[in-house]
UniProtKB/Swiss-Prot annotation:
Residue(s) carrying Phosphotyrosine: 80
Biased composition, class Basic and acidic residues, residue ranges: 8-34, 41-50, 291-314, 342-364, 391-448, 479-493
Name of the protein this chain belongs to: Serrate RNA effector molecule homolog
Family statement drawn from the similarity comment of this UniProt entry: Belongs to the ARS2 family.
Residues recorded as bearing Phosphoserine in the entry: 82, 304, 332, 352, 429, 641, 643
Gene it is expressed from: Ars2
Lineage: Eukaryota, Metazoa, Ecdysozoa, Arthropoda, Hexapoda
Composition bias, Basic residues: 365-374
Organism: Drosophila yakuba (Fruit fly)
PANTHER family per UniProt: ARSENITE-RESISTANCE PROTEIN 2, SERRATE RNA EFFECTOR MOLECULE HOMOLOG
One GO term describing the cellular component: nucleoplasm
Acidic residues compositional bias, start-end: 332-341
Protein purpose: Acts as a mediator between the cap-binding complex (CBC) and RNA-mediated gene silencing (RNAi). Involved in innate immunity via the short interfering RNAs (siRNAs) processing machinery by restricting the viral RNA production. Also involved microRNA (miRNA)-mediated silencing by contributing to the stability and delivery of primary miRNA transcripts to the primary miRNA processing complex containing drosha and pasha.
Length: 944
């Protein structure tokens, strides 16, 4: 009774403990006294001691389990036990993986193609006993720890677990037959579930859909054919032969790659002259920050009421590229970025007049002031809007790290620009009469006059850089420009220089090989290319988009690259994309930097003659394999016989693979360079056995003729097939990437000496790294895919007809597709094939779609469960807590973790199965036989 009274007094004195601060309770917990018995410190109360609740209170302590704070991460522990104490696994209310896998990950936009409840039902139906004590394995484990997003297949039963689901009188042969069937059905089920989960996604259709995959293949083949034409052109004019794939010739290699890119972009020989020009310093564009003088000039500018109304009613969002000025002018969130172009459009427009009335000017200026000044005191009704706009401005300032020049520099730049514009007015107006009667040669004539303006513009914003996409006829554009210049005021002359730059740029070579790009870190599998293009087409200068293949470790999310023209303000476009969501998915747009090192060195050992000859052989094999895969050079009349000989020789692995007439120019007479030569007789007569070479090494021997042949092959693989040979990798979907032919690996500096063992080891290792290009992809046969659950088209059509044939009553049948009623099922069949033949065709395409997925030996699928793929024999036979996989059944009753009574097999290494169950068939079990020594005395004691 005394104990109860004391405990009641303590509770009453501490009744406000829930309102005290966490730090106070932590101190009280740390300063507690270690007093035994029931009258000890408060830390020994039942609700405070997690170890007493279940034992002394008959399980009542389960209401106060402290596990929840452990899974919330770092934070205060309100009222439970010491942070240093961890409960045994048997006390856990939920498993460690409860939060990570069941709930949708917010950064993936709630997308999860696999219904976790369905997985749980499927797995728990076989393993219902796992609900005890939270020891069940996760239905879907993550590879690489709990923080990984990698999905896996559910765990497959091993043979021991499968035996426990069968009858005890089953034979060994029957067990093995059923277990084989179980594994086959399990694999079929996983393939079918994966197909159903991803069949509506664009990336999956591009791989296996009977129509979409053909379109995608033809598109890729068109890219390759275009690259082949460019390579042949460069090979014929000597560009390819004039360069060596050495890291010392990095500039020449970059020039060749850029030449290819310009040709691929549709450039001409005139555009190639841009490669001879020194690149400008203005590479990374910054946000435009104009001086206040230009803002005031913009406010004084005159525009028609029609244009002003269009600007006010424009529904486009605020943050767009500065190049997108055909639709609207300055918005409330853009401040002064588009002021120059707004004035420019007024200069060129037919409705801009200098004779507008003064009241109208005041009214227009008042409207512009309201649109530009966020803190305007004249607008009383927009206080909340101005505060939100100021927040937006702060975010933009934080987003744009490199923000303009200082006020003094901007003022000086503005002054210099105005003086240069005044100096230009007289020469340009004198040329107006000459431009009317002859072709325009103004770009050359004005180069020297524009240099000073361009230097000043370099200190300003990239918006002054012209956009080569927006072009009109040079003659008309220049004529209109020059006619308007005499009538404009001083401020407008400054603004029209953008048009002058556009005019001059039209006659100059185009830098088509240089682009700006944005990287999308997070694209859901359900997002299509058309949706991304619809968003990007709003921005002027958009070129293309590349979407990578999905990754299983990222839950099939993809990455993307959006390519724009070089002269756009890429940061503003990136800001606009970050303010948009596609299918409730944040794309995570960031600016993609330019390539840092385009020519990267490889091992210098590759220049050795023996290695070069081996590389020629490997390059020729890869070129043949890839040409045949994409049907390049397939117009040869004897293609069938040649390909058959190529297949036969590739299986043999001999150099005779290249002994046929190929239309590929880099493979012609290739066998002449594959025959090795050596002065064996001379070495034998002189006693040069090569022992010294093996020990001391030999100098690098270069054969320029072999190297030139190899360089042609390496450049062919790099330009046509996007294979970087010296990096033993392929750059996928390069035709859609921002940098076509961006990176190449070349031979690095050669070592002084090299041993024969090093050479042989290098050749062997490098060939193993290139196996992915040397082996041909062979699709699975009909018999092989039948084991994987392939479908038959006619069978599926019959199932479709039966599913759409419903009997309502006697001699009364319904077709759900049309809602019509018929007297018999045969009429419905005829009706479906006649009126709904498109539905029948869809069923056949679906069957072909699924079978195409099964035929691919490298088909994407979920990785196997770790318990299925990694199950050592010694580990799988162990039970309890020491085994690799959890036991099939829990320990006996509610025993503590790892404990088992005698002869029950609990604990580490124990059996952990009820004794009534068996582990092996009856044939492998025998009756226990007792042994007794017949020579022993009758009543003797047994000591051993």
């Amino acid at each position: 009774m005394a104990d109860s009274d004391d405990e009641y007094d303590r509770k009453r004195r501490d009744k406000f403990r829930g309102e005290r601060s966490d730090s106070y309770r932590t101190e009280r917990r740390d300063d507690r006294r270690a007093v035994g018995g029931s009258t000890g410190a408060r830390d020994e109360w039942a609700e405070r001691n997690p170890f007493r609740g279940g034992a002394s209170a008959g399980g009542g302590g389960a209401r106060h389990r402290p596990d929840y704070s452990d899974y919330r991460g770092p934070g205060a522990r309100p009222r439970y036990g010491s942070p240093g104490r961890d409960l045994p696994p048997a006390k856990r209310m939920r498993p460690d993986w409860g939060d990570g896998d069941v709930r949708a990950n917010p950064r993936f936009g709630g997308y999860d193609p696999y219904l976790m409840q369905a997985w749980n039902d499927h797995y728990q139906s076989m393993h219902s006993a796992f609900s005890h004590a939270g020891h069940a394995p996760p239905v879907r484990e993550s590879i690489g720890g709990g923080g990984s997003d990698t999905l896996t297949q559910p765990a497959m039963l091993n043979l021991k677990q499968f035996l426990d689901t069968q009858d005890e009188n089953i034979s060994d042969s029957e067990v093995m037959r059923k277990y084989t069937e179980y594994k086959t059905d399990f694999k079929r089920q996983q393939l079918n579930e994966f197909f159903v989960a991803h069949k509506d996604e664009e990336w999956f259709k591009n791989k296996y859909h009977p129509e979409d995959s053909v379109k995608r293949s033809e598109e890729q083949r068109g890219f390759l054919q275009r690259r082949t034409d460019v390579f042949v052109e460069l090979l014929e004019n000597g560009t390819i032969g004039s360069v060596k794939v050495d890291s010392s010739q990095g500039d020449a290699l970059i020039r060749v790659l850029d030449t290819c890119v310009i040709k691929l972009e549709g450039g001409t020989d005139e555009d190639l002259k841009v490669l001879d020009e020194k690149p400008k310093d203005l590479v990374v564009y910054e946000r435009k920050t104009e001086p206040m003088e230009s803002v005031k000039a913009m406010e004084k500018a005159i525009s028609s009421p029609k244009e002003e109304k269009i600007r006010e009613e424009d529904p486009l969002p605020a943050v767009v590229s500065p190049q997108q000025k055909t639709a609207r002018s300055v918005n409330s969130d853009e401040e002064n970025w588009n002021d120059e172009d707004a004035v420019t459009k007024k200069d060129l427009g037919e409705h801009s007049k200098d004779t507008d009335s003064k009241p109208e000017d005041k009214q227009l200026n008042k409207k512009k002031t309201k649109k530009r000044k966020r803190n305007s005191s004249d607008d009383d009704s927009s206080s909340s809007e101005s505060s939100s706009s100021s927040d937006e401005e702060k975010l933009k300032e934080k987003y744009d790290v490199e923000d303009g020049l200082r006020a003094e520099q901007k003022a000086e730049a503005e002054k210099d620009r105005q003086e240069a514009a005044k100096a230009k007015q007289e020469p340009e107006s004198s040329k107006l009469e000459e431009l009317v009667g002859k072709e325009i040669t103004e770009p050359k004539e004005l180069d020297s006059k524009i240099n000073t303006v361009e230097n000043d513009d370099t200190l300003k914003s990239p918006e002054m850089t012209p956009n080569p996409i927006k072009r009109t006829d040079n003659g008309n554009g220049n004529k209109v420009e020059d006619e308007e210049k005499p009538s404009v005021d001083e401020n407008k002359v400054v603004e029209t220089e953008t048009i002058d730059l556009d005019k001059i740029k039209d006659g100059q070579p185009r830098a088509l090989h240089r682009t700006s790009s944005i990287f999308l870190r997070n694209l859901a599998p359900s997002i299509t290319r058309a949706e991304i293009e619809a968003v990007c087409n709003r921005f002027t200068g958009y070129l293309r988009v590349a979407i990578a293949d999905p990754l299983v470790e990222r839950r099939w999310y993809r990455r993307g690259w959006i390519t724009f023209m070089r002269d756009v303000n890429i940061k503003e476009i990136c800001w606009g994309l970050n303010n948009q969501r596609l299918r409730d998915c944040e794309m995570g747009a960031i600016v993609n930097r330019d390539l840092s090192r385009r020519v990267r060195p490889a091992n210098g050992l590759t220049a050795h003659k023996q290695v070069v000859r081996s590389d020629i052989k490997l390059c020729a094999k890869i070129a043949l394999n890839l040409d045949e895969r994409f049907r390049l050079w397939a117009e040869v009349p004897t293609d069938d016989s040649n390909s058959a000989r190529a297949d036969e020789s590739s299986e043999n692995g001999s150099g005779s693979t290249y002994g046929f007439n190929s239309k590929n120019p880099v493979l012609q007479n290739i066998t002449d360079y594959l025959i090795e030569e050596a002065s064996a007789e001379e070495d034998e007569l002189l006693g040069l056995t090569g022992e010294n070479k093996d020990t001391e090494g030999e100098a690098i021997e270069r054969d320029e003729q072999l190297i030139s042949v190899l360089d042609r092959l390496v450049l062919y693989l790099r330009i046509v097939h996007s294979v970087d040979y010296y990096n033993h990798c392929e750059y996928p979907y390069e035709d859609e990437m921002p940098n076509r032919c961006g990176i190449i690996h070349a031979r690095g500096p050669a070592p002084v000496r090299v041993t024969n063992n090093d050479v042989q080891e290098y050749i062997k290792t490098y060939e193993s790294k290139l196996q992915q290009f040397l082996t041909k992809t062979v699709l699975l046969s009909d018999e092989e895919i039948k084991d994987l659950g392939a479908k038959d088209a006619e069978t599926e059509v019959e199932k479709f007809v039966q599913a759409n044939t419903q009997e309502l009553a006697k001699d009364k049948w319904l077709c759900p597709l049309s809602g019509k009623k018929f007297k018999g099922p045969e009429f419905i069949r005829k009706h479906i094939f006649n009126k709904h033949d498109e539905k029948v065709d869809e069923v056949r395409k679906e069957v072909q779609y699924f079978n195409n997925y099964l035929r691919d030996p490298k088909r994407p699928q979920l990785p196997e469960h770790p318990g299925t793929s990694k199950r050592p024999e010694s580990e799988s036979a162990r039970g309890g807590g020491g085994g690799y996989r959890p036991p099939m059944y829990p320990p006996f009753s509610a025993m503590p973790y790892g404990f088992g009574p005698p002869m029950m097999g609990g604990g580490r290494g124990g059996r952990n199965f009820p004794p009534a169950r068996r582990e092996l068939p009856l044939e492998h079990q025998r009756r226990l036989i007792g042994y007794h020594d017949l020579d022993a005395p009758a009543n003797s004691d047994m000591f051993d």
